[in-house]
Amino acid sequence: MNGVAAIAKGMATTLKVLFRKPVTVDYPYVKRPRAPRFRGRHELRTYENGLEMCVGCELCQVACPAAAITVQAAENDPDNPHSPGERYGYKYQVDLLRCIFCGMCEEACPTDCLHLTQEFELADFTRESLILQKEQLVNRNPSGFKVPMNVYPPFRRKAVNA
């Protein structure tokens, strides 16, 4: 009698789940929404006037627990500036093979130039293409970033309603 009850219980569970809406989606044609705080591909932001927000402080490199970020700073040329500061990120490299997408680099950035986007489709055929150089990271189409008044404007983090 004990075995019959177990089979009946299992069949009841099967029938209950059978008529539910399926959890799977027809990806890539139908995409599920991501969480608002999802962290994906890295992006370096620029100001509206084209200057890079990165001042080459290397704090993102220091904060990265996986050592996935490499930054080399160079002195800024006053005649042809790259950023509003004295220095700029001459070489900026993110190794997506090492990155754990924790967001510590984003939090460490004093100018708020480093941003983790919602982009998550990062698969590729070669390992070299997953090491992103500065040219691949810089977003030349800024939206809402004003011309800097000074090198380190007082950025404030907004609280996210959880």
Curated annotation (Swiss-Prot):
Domain 4Fe-4S ferredoxin-type, which positions?
44-74, 90-119
Which family, according to UniProt? Belongs to the complex I 23 kDa subunit family.
Q: What organism does the record attribute this protein to?
A: Symbiobacterium thermophilum (strain DSM 24528 / JCM 14929 / IAM 14863 / T)
Q: What NCBIfam families does the record point to?
A: NuoI, PRK05888.1-3, PRK05888.1-4
Q: Does the keyword Metal-binding apply?
A: yes
Which positions does UniProt annotate for [4Fe-4S] cluster 2 binding?
64, 99, 102, 105
Keyword entries, A-Z: 4Fe-4S, Cell membrane, Iron, Iron-sulfur, Membrane, Metal-binding, NAD, Quinone, Repeat, Translocase, Ubiquinone
Tell me, how does this one assemble? Answer: NDH-1 is composed of 14 different subunits. Subunits NuoA, H, J, K, L, M, N constitute the membrane sector of the complex.
Q: Which cofactor does it need?
A: [4Fe-4S] cluster
GO molecular function term, any single one: quinone binding
Q: Name one Pfam family in it.
A: Fer4_7
Give me the comment on cofactor binding: Binds 2 [4Fe-4S] clusters per subunit.
Asked if the keyword Iron belongs to this entry, the reply reads yes
Bilayer topology term: Peripheral membrane protein
Localization in the cell? Cell membrane
Cite the binding residues for [4Fe-4S] cluster 1: 54, 57, 60, 109
Q: What is this protein called?
A: NADH-quinone oxidoreductase subunit I 1
| Gene Ontology annotations of biological process type | aerobic respiration
Q: What is its main location?
A: membrane
What exactly does this protein do? NDH-1 shuttles electrons from NADH, via FMN and iron-sulfur (Fe-S) centers, to quinones in the respiratory chain. The immediate electron acceptor for the enzyme in this species is believed to be ubiquinone. Couples the redox reaction to proton translocation (for every two electrons transferred, four hydrogen ions are translocated across the cytoplasmic membrane), and thus conserves the redox energy in a proton gradient.
Q: What is its EC number?
A: 7.1.1.-
Gene3D superfamilies found in the cross-reference section = 3.30.70.3270
Catalyzed reactions per annotation: a quinone + NADH + 5 H(+)(in) = a quinol + NAD(+) + 4 H(+)(out)
